[in-house]
């Protein structure tokens, strides 16, 4: 498998956004500004809450990040949907890490809860993805639960995140 490691740097994640990490048919991450992590610090095929795979990734918060200027004026907060998207990004990244091919698409989430916020004064966001199941048939799909932590406190939880890989995304 191409580039199958337990950690990835920002440069690696940017290579993924260009389609250079998991081969020409592997899934890609979004490019900045939508790339919502700076590094993946742990990836395992076993482990996590269900012993079916685990990812831990981080985003360093800077007070001048693009979303703070528009969400909201005079009340800056990172949009919760960006944290949710980061969890979907990581599920798709994991499918590529396992050797899956195709274009990643978020397929849903059962439940999302927000119990905190990410502010310009925050320092670090950490994502935890616990895989429940991987389906590897005509459609490759990952199902996982996720948590988002800000400066050590869990502030978002998501259950039953789903991402699929499509050989032809026009039929999605």
Curated annotation (Swiss-Prot):
InterPro entries attached to this UniProt entry: FabA, FabA_FabZ, HotDog_dom_sf
Cited SUPFAM superfamilies: Thioesterase/thiol ester dehydrase-isomerase
EC number: 4.2.1.59, 5.3.3.14
Localization annotation: Cytoplasm
UniProt entry keywords in alphabetical sequence: Cytoplasm, Fatty acid biosynthesis, Fatty acid metabolism, Isomerase, Lipid biosynthesis, Lipid metabolism, Lyase
Reaction catalysed by this enzyme: a (3R)-hydroxyacyl-[ACP] = a (2E)-enoyl-[ACP] + H2O; (3R)-hydroxydecanoyl-[ACP] = (2E)-decenoyl-[ACP] + H2O; (2E)-decenoyl-[ACP] = (3Z)-decenoyl-[ACP]
MF terms in GO: (3R)-hydroxyacyl-[acyl-carrier-protein] dehydratase activity; trans-2-decenoyl-acyl-carrier-protein isomerase activity
Presence of the UniProt keyword Lipid biosynthesis in the record: yes
Catalytic residues (positions): 71
A GO CC term assigned to this protein in UniProt: cytoplasm
Pathway: Lipid metabolism; fatty acid biosynthesis
Transmembrane segments: none
Chief site of localization: cytoplasm
CDD domains documented for this protein: FabA (cd01287)
Protein role: Necessary for the introduction of cis unsaturation into fatty acids. Catalyzes the dehydration of (3R)-3-hydroxydecanoyl-ACP to E-(2)-decenoyl-ACP and then its isomerization to Z-(3)-decenoyl-ACP. Can catalyze the dehydratase reaction for beta-hydroxyacyl-ACPs with saturated chain lengths up to 16:0, being most active on intermediate chain length.
Subunit structure: Homodimer.
Family note: Belongs to the thioester dehydratase family. FabA subfamily.
Protein name: 3-hydroxydecanoyl-[acyl-carrier-protein] dehydratase
Record organism: Blochmanniella pennsylvanica (strain BPEN)
């Amino acid at each position: 498998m191409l580039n199958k490691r337990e950690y990835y740097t920002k440069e690696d994640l940017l290579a993924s956004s260009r389609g250079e990490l998991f081969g020409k048919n592997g899934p890609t991450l979004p490019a900045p500004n939508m790339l919502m992590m700076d590094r993946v610090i742990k990836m395992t095929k076993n482990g996590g809450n269900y012993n079916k795979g685990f990812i831990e990734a981080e985003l360093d918060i800077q007070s001048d990040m693009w979303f703070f200027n528009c969400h909201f004026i005079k009340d800056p907060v990172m949009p919760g949907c960006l944290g949710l998207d980061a969890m979907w990004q990581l599920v798709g990244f994991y499918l590529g890490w396992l050797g899956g091919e195709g274009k990643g698409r978020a397929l849903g989430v059962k439940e999302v809860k927000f119990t905190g916020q990410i502010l310009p004064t925050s320092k670090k966001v950490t994502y935890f993805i616990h895989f429940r199941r991987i389906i590897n048939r005509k459609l490759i799909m990952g199902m996982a639960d996720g948590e988002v932590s800000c400066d050590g406190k869990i502030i978002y939880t998501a259950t039953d995140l789903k991402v699929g890989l499509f050989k032809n995304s026009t039929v999605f």
